[in-house]
Amino acid sequence: MGPKLLESRLCLLLLLGLVLMLASCLGQTPSQKFAIQHINNNTNLQCNVEMMRINRARRTCKGLNTFLHTSFANAVGVCGNPSGLCSDKRSQNCHNSSSRVHITVCNITSRATNYTQCRYQSRRSLEYYTVACDPRTPQDSPMYPVVPVHLDGTF
């Protein structure tokens, strides 16, 4: 009885470890990645600081990134607007915002071998934006059935 109990506990421990390992491999959902890369309510953000955070996850310097100064909930609301053709000319899940928001565009000015050393310039403006939306994943909040997953452009 002793060896079987030890064996079953070991199997349970291995199974728990496997579940935890799989959960950590799942990483961010597409909507979480969208929020991290494009939603920032700070209209005075510093591109060098914010892009270092994004580049850390990528392990390389991103050349261009647009931050929308709005909430994730407002971006989700855009998913309720009529859908249309995305800039890739294939996808039909793009939605235009009905109001303009402040944006900051960070454009790389100095690319470095080490992603922490890249430098950016900022351009601020007030623009409409287009997001691609998909049904939420099981890891996303059930609060929103459809979520933004890609910033398709500004205009």
Curated annotation (Swiss-Prot):
Major subcellular site: cytoplasm
Entry coiled-coil feature ranges: none
Domain of life: Eukaryota
A GO-annotated cellular component: cytoplasm
InterPro entries: RNaseA (IPR001427), RNaseA-like_dom_sf (IPR036816), RNaseA_AS (IPR023411), RNaseA_domain (IPR023412)
Active site: 38 (proton acceptor), 150 (proton donor)
GO molecular function, one term: endonuclease activity
Disulphide-bridged cysteine pairs: 47-106, 61-118, 79-133, 86-94
Binding site for substrate: 33, 62-66
Signal peptide coordinates: 1-25
Keyword DNA damage in record: no
Glycosylation site list: 41, 96, 107, 114
Cell location: Cytoplasmic granule
Family: Belongs to the pancreatic ribonuclease family.
Function: Cytotoxin and helminthotoxin with ribonuclease activity. Possesses a wide variety of biological activities.
This protein's name: Eosinophil cationic protein 1
Origin species: Mus musculus (Mouse)
Gene: Ear1
